[in-house]
Amino acid sequence: MQRENEVQHVFLVGAKSLGAYGGYETFVYKLTEYHQNKKNIKYHVACKANGDGCMDETKVDGVTRINDHEFEFHNAHCFKIDIPQIGPAQAIYYDVAALKACCKYIKEHRIKHPIVYIMACRIGPFAGHFYKEIHKLGGTVYLNPDGECEIIWTTRKKPEFMRVCAA
């Protein structure tokens, strides 16, 4: 259970960028924008470093660049994942690489009780491995089971428990 003065670290995996590319991207943009002044929440957002829909933080106002693959935006720590051009398998590769990066960051920074929110269910047989690793690190995993983030965000016609997970 989180104490009042502790920061809740939330890792977001599944959006290619922060911006107008699609539903997940808009969801993450609005979520981080809405919570940017909250001192007790720290978002860590995985972004695609190259290819279609990749994050180009130089085109976004308010970005603080950390290095070639990390930046701060809306008080969220954003990190870019390099993706090989392997056709439709890019989405799966991105999710697996992003989850590996999340686990590495959690370990290196000794983050207690992290939350990892996976927006799209694309990792299939790899899910169990990451669930075990994140749980072993003291974390919780939330998976958007139907991958309809934009519908949840805009229409709010999902059951109450889905709204809590996605909004």
Each predicted region: which residue ranges?
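Nucleotide-sugar donor phosphate/pyrophosphate-binding loop at the beta->alpha transition
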Residues: 139-140, 150-167
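N-proximal low-complexity "stem/linker" segments adjacent to membrane-targeting elements
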Residues: 2-5
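Glycine-rich phosphate-binding loop signature in dinucleotide/nucleotide-binding domains
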Residues: 105-114
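A generic structural motif
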Residues: 38-44, 111-112, 138-139
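N-terminal strand-loop element at the rim of the active site
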Residues: 7, 12-21, 34-89, 122
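An aromatic- and histidine-rich active-site surface loop
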Residues: 90-101, 114-150
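A short, charged, and often flexible helix/loop element on the N-terminal side
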Residues: 73-100, 154-161
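Conserved alpha-helical elements of sugar-nucleotide-dependent glycosyltransferases
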Residues: 23-31
